[in-house]
Regions:
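Substrate-gating cap/lid alpha-helix
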Residues: 224-265, 286, 291
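Active-site segments of SGNH/GDSL-like serine hydrolases
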Residues: 181-185, 207-240
Length: 307
């Protein structure tokens, strides 16, 4: 065969080979994308029990934590179905706060709230007198605070960027009443012994730093159905179980002569279907809306701690 005829054949073969390689690469990329595409239940990572040490200022009223805390458009006076039944397995006794006359805003203003992102939501929802700057709200960096790290991580008051250890802060402020709402992020990952030991460490820190402070161990709030189903590690049965542990912890301190009480706000935010009604959530199924916070605050005022 003449050289002049060989060259076109070689070039055609090379072009054909390059086309085959290109098509193979395209099919490989498409296959890889399909295999790794997010699907419900597989793209959610399990939350860490660690709460990072602050590396940047705590969010101000114009900033928000990782999870959105904006309130849906719902009237705070809207009536929604609630179960009205106490959380399962909560022991009965005088340590469980009973309904009283409304103690009023003066009573509410004497309270300090310590909690995770479900408490931090009080700031952007502006449900307290000082709104987004309220020093009544104690939280961790970025608005989050995990139960195992409450006594070792820095705590921030309101929009302040000055963090202090919990014991240090309480020694200075010595609040009359402290409402603790903690445990939602670890309600499924810790057994009763470990959960209770972390919770007791928080209470012991409060009592040693401010002995006259009355402590309200507030129940963990329920979640909406969509959150329960999409985050299988965060569900109402586990939350109810953890609330029973919190109740037992409060009972132990109360029976030893300490002014430690339990408040069941869980059942007040639980719908008849076993989930938190969606208007009580800010839209993510976990954090509360302004309407829900107003219910919680109203419950605190109408379940006054004994003098």
């Amino acid at each position: 065969m003449k050289p002049s005829k060989i060259k076109p054949i070689v070039f055609s073969a090379i072009a054909f080979l390059l086309m085959i390689i290109t098509l193979a690469c395209v099919f490989s990329l498409v296959f890889f994308h399909i295999q790794h595409k997010d699907t419900p239940g597989t793209s959610q990572s399990r939350p860490s029990t660690a709460d990072p040490t602050p590396s940047s200022p705590v969010p101000t009223s114009s900033e928000t934590p990782t999870e959105p805390l904006s309130s849906p458009s719902v009237s705070s006076s809207e009536t929604l179905p609630v179960s009205g039944e106490p959380s399962p397995s909560i022991p009965e006794g005088d340590f469980v706060l009973k309904k009283t006359e409304d103690a009023g805003l003066d009573y509410q203003n004497r309270i300090v709230f310590l909690g995770d992102s479900t408490t931090y939501g009080m700031l952007p929802n502006m449900v307290l007198p000082d709104k987004a700057d309220s020093k009544q709200v104690l939280h961790g960096a970025g608005g989050t605070l995990s139960l195992p790290n409450v006594t070792t991580n820095l705590i921030y008051a309101g929009s302040s960027t000055e963090g202090k250890l919990l014991g240090e802060y309480l020694s200075e402020v010595k609040p009359e009443i402290l409402v603790i709402t903690l445990g939602v992020g670890v309600s499924d990952s810790l057994n009763e012994s470990r959960f209770s030991s972390y919770y007791k460490l928080v209470i012991d820190t409060v009592l040693s730093s401010s002995p006259n402070t009355k402590i309200i161990c507030n129940s963990i709030y329920p979640v909406c159905q969509a959150r329960d189903e999409s985050y299988q590690h965060l569900n109402n049965p586990d939350i109810a179980k953890a609330n029973a542990w919190i109740g037992k912890v409060a009972q132990g301190y109360y029976e030893s002569g300490k002014k430690v009480y339990y408040l069941d706000s869980y059942s007040l935010l639980l719908g008849s279907d076993g989930y938190m009604p969606s208007p009580y959530s800010n839209g993510d199924g976990l954090h509360l809306s302004k309407a829900a916070f107003e219910i919680v605050l109203g419950t605190i005022r109408t379940h006054k701690v004994p003098d």
